[in-house]
Amino acid sequence: WFGTVMRGDIEPIRVGARSNIQENCVLHTDSGFPLTIGENCTIGHSAIIHGCTIGDNTLVGMGATVLNGAKIGKNCLIGANALITEGKEIPDNSLVVGAPGKVIRTLDDAAIAALTASAHRYVENAKRFASGLVEVHRPADFDPA
């Protein structure tokens, strides 16, 4: 989405199909720490995702930070403003909150379905935005001063 920074200058960044990276996120890598985001993932506004692996169908909440070498499993929900520290491994189907992030429970089928629905809504938004794009022209006498 608009305003996201993805710096793959040191290691590669891979984002899976139907995943969305929302406004003001920063995705970056370090030497030896590529960044992989699985399919059907939602990365919330202003999250910082750094040299880690995020499994399929996972939602990382707004303002969360995931650091080098962290591995988040499939079908996880990382709460807003959570901090996933370097090298931390989060099991599949986990709800994680806090700084540092702690698993507080296992997600049930309804919660996992909601993660999938979130990613699908953003796919539909992308289609809607793309179909409504129009070229904007400045008037010849435009003066930004």
Provide a role label for each language-model segment.
Residues D9, V15-A17, E23-C25, T29-D30, ...:
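Glycine-rich hexapeptide-repeat left-handed beta-helix
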